[in-house]
């Protein structure tokens, strides 16, 4: 229906010989302002040098009559408000029943090639709650963007080079020796996690004392430990519903000479200089807002983290992606400007790299702050979250707020089986519909694809129809703005609309035509609830 309104306005402007206008049509929060509203008249004020209300009148007078539109009004400074006939709203049910799993698909991405990189935690320990939020939010965004016509690839960058891996090797060797009963002390800056103890024991069980005789012990442990940690990370992410297209190794950048090539590219572009024995990138001259230049090669010849990151982003862009979308932790806020500067320095555009910064998560239980796992006495991990509340609840609660908002996650609320739990409220709507449909099937045969939409004109049916019709636009906006939390907001609204409909209408009655129409409506609601839940990686149970 929204597309039809846009087309009506577009045709009217054509009659007025006005073109090149980006027509915006929104859904007013207040139904007194119609079902759809456009500010196109106000957009044209400067161009036409007329009062926007006068422009609005001219546009309306040139809009062709349409059987779906009841009336058009001008409001405020020049908003054009469209009121749709109640009887025409029902057509969305037929579309949903026909589209089924495809309902909500759109082409706002127009095939744009996007590389979404997310989580990318160091392979030196278990994933924590911050990684869990990044995982849930980013995976949901990937699903939404794929549904919206983007050619999207999901990538995990394995930080398997650098000093953190040297520390991992030292930590693993100490734990291995301790498992053998040897006297070995863990350095203060080593990794003290339980997973490293398990790794040490695993090395002892698999190899006994034989590894101590190897001349290449460090290199062997490096490969083994990284593989072990990545196996654990992949297991946790898989149990959380994540899939990746590519796992990219930082180490491969060095092995394939890509770091040297990136440095060569920066030198050719003329944005590097030497000072105090170090090689610097002139990020302040590249217009991305970085407040000081950055070191690439230190005076001692070692490379900074930025250097390999530059090589990695050059590799991404050289692979032909139109947009690189990095999802980073809150501690990376100041890092984005220098990354963008490096992209520009290599001859690409700054807007080919965008970053989402995920803010912190605070865990609560009945409003009380929780810092440690009762089971382990350690910081709470992604695995702890899954074990505590389940993957569905963990994902839903971690996606509910925008990336730039701090998030409070209350375990008690997530486990509650009442309307106070937003996920339970949504899933219960789906389960209730499934129950009604099973009940109807036991009583008679109904053909939901052959119903009378004219019977869906009561207040609660109309509200539900409007909510169903909004869904494709919600998906498109969530994709365009990188905001998967919009899907959670929509699910709350749709579930509320259904529950109100159910509480005020008897679905199965002796009037078969009315029953059939109501069953078609709630089947459309069921499909939409399922599709929206799937976009955030959450199940739609048939029974609860």
What are the functions of these language-model segments?
Residues 91-96:
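Short, charged, solvent-exposed linker or helix-capping segments at domain edges/interfaces
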